[in-house]
Amino acid sequence: MKLRLSDTLNSLMLGGLLMASTFASADNKPTKPYWQDVQVVAVNKEYPRSSFMTYENRANALTGKFEKSKYYQLLNGTWKFYFVDSYKNLPANITDPAISTADWADIKVPGNWEVQGHGVAIYTNHGYEFQPRNPQPPTLPEANPVGVYRRDIDIPADWDGRDIYLHLAGAKSGVYVYINGQEVGYSEDSKNSAEFLINKFVKPGKNVLTLKIYRWSTGSYLECQDFWRISGIERDVFLYSQPKAALKDFRVTSTLDDTYKDGIFKLGVDLRNNGSTAGNMTLVYELLDANGKVVATGEKATNVAAGETRTVSFDQTLPDVKTRTS
């Protein structure tokens, strides 16, 4: 299999990421609910990665638009919505796909539920809106509102045999994910994206996606900034798919040599094989300048065992680069 980096990537996020989290499995449930357990901030969630999309050809990749990929499906729009002022008032079967949503409200996604008629928006410049005085971390109020979002999703027939991911670009605060009534996983850290591998939960054609979102979670103690305290799905929701053997993540390091004339380009690419057998993979990258001209390229072959990830690295000097200062 040959992977061309320029066919796969359309955007890159550079920066530092500090993680202090526990990635748990839904098969090993804690005694406390996830949203009350300070030791759990993610369940069955994919490790964070750079932002990019998978495309079927180079031309579509170069547009830089996710919607140009046949392996991308945006889920923004009108969803069904059920709201309660306290989690204690939530029906036990609320995530059952068989229950009717005829009496549920409509809600726009993305969009905070407080500005769409559900609950109360709170502004404070410091302190915790749910416990203004004498907070006792990780204790949360019993009157913790919950919003349940639901919609149908359609899995294309040509995605069969591929890895299928659900991407939540931002949802606040504690998010449980269900597909066809089965728990997929959980996420906090509401200003960062969350991804879930959903292959074993979906079938070709119609499926029911449900998100159960708690307004406050133990993660809320790390989200105390000077802004409106509002809740719900705040950014895009989408599905995408990749081959079983695919590019999982990449890192770019760019600097100058000691003369400050030549550029030093370093690329690290993580290739993951979710197939049942080892696979021979060839990675090809292209680096383009502002005019679309290829200024660097490279190719390497490697073997990735089933269920494993392997990093492929490239180093190249770019003579007489156009430098800039900030």
Short names for language-model regions:
Residues K29-P30, Y34-Q36, K65-F66, K80-V84, ...:
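Accessory beta-strand-rich segments of carbohydrate-active enzymes
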Residues I198-K200, S313-S326:
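Short, hydrophobic beta-strand segments
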Residues A20-N28:
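Bacterial Sec-dependent signal peptides at the C-terminal "C-region" and cleavage site
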Residues D27-L74, T78-K80, Y87:
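N-terminal pre-domain segments of enzymes
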Residues N10-S21:
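Bacterial N-terminal signal peptides
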Residues V146, P204-G205, D262, A305-T309:
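Solvent-exposed, conformationally flexible loop/turn segments
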Residues V252-T259:
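Short beta-strand segments of immunoglobulin-like
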